[in-house]
């Protein structure tokens, strides 16, 4: 036996043909089946199993990064091993489940080459809506919208971080995500707050986003508040939380 949970996008979860709640753990035995329907909202759903999947680890992680040749793509019919579990079924409290909202406003701490961008370029960035491009992936989210005047001139490549906002010569910003490259040479306007990056990752192509500037101190306070909320989170018995989908 093992325990599984499905979170993320708003999908319909069925176990052995019965509709079950998201954001809850569910006990499974040999021969049980899981079916995920199309997402009503959001881009990615996550299937978690107790103890993780049995796969070769690279740098302490079993995540697959095909671009770097780390791991392999899952094939139809492939069998994955997972850990056993006899845990009680638990559920995330409904009030603690992240909400998938349309047209999210992403908070940004300005930095990088901020001083090299004109005031007009900053006004365009923070005063406009941008659409998620079809070319987005786990490496980064490309955005389409009003062109932002990018500083000219050569510069040395430097380290990138989760949420870094690069502005290439075409003026269309790129927000770097989990599979980002380690260094980059495009001018950087700032960094999307780490707490907001998942909102961008869950946006489908064509969805719109906008940006709001916050201070480093405000960002630190928001992260501390979120960390405290997670540390004080109390799961509920299965059936007393989660989100039921049809």
Segments predicted by a language model, with ranges:
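Conserved "landmark" site that anchors the functional core of diverse proteins
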Residues: 1-246
């Amino acid at each position: 036996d093992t325990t599984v949970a499905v979170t993320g996008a708003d999908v319909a979860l069925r176990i052995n043909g019965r509709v079950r709640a998201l954001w809850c753990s569910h006990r499974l035995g040999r021969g049980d089946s899981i079916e995920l329907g199309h997402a009503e909202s959001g881009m990615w759903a996550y299937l978690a199993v107790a103890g993780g999947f049995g796969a070769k680890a690279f740098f302490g992680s079993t995540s697959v990064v095909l671009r770097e040749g780390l791991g392999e793509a899952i094939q139809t019919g492939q069998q994955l091993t997972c850990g056993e579990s006899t845990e009680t079924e638990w559920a995330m409290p409904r009030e603690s489940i992240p909400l998938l909202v349309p047209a999210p406003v992403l908070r940004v701490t300005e930095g990088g080459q901020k001083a090299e961008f004109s005031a007009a370029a900053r006004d365009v960035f923070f005063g406009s809506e941008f659409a998620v491009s079809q070319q987005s992936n786990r490496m980064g989210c490309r955005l389409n919208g009003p062109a932002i005047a990018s500083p000219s001139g050569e510069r040395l490549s430097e380290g990138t971080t989760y949420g870094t906002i690069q502005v290439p010569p075409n003026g269309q910003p790129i927000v770097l995500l989990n599979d980002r490259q380690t260094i980059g040479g495009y001018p950087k306007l700032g960094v999307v707050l780490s707490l907001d990056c998942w909102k961008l990752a869950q946006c489908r192509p064509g969805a719109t986003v906008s940006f709001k500037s916050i201070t480093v101190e405000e960002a630190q306070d928001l992260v501390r508040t979120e960390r405290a909320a997670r540390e004080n989170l109390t799961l509920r018995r299965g059936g007393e939380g989660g989100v039921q989908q049809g």
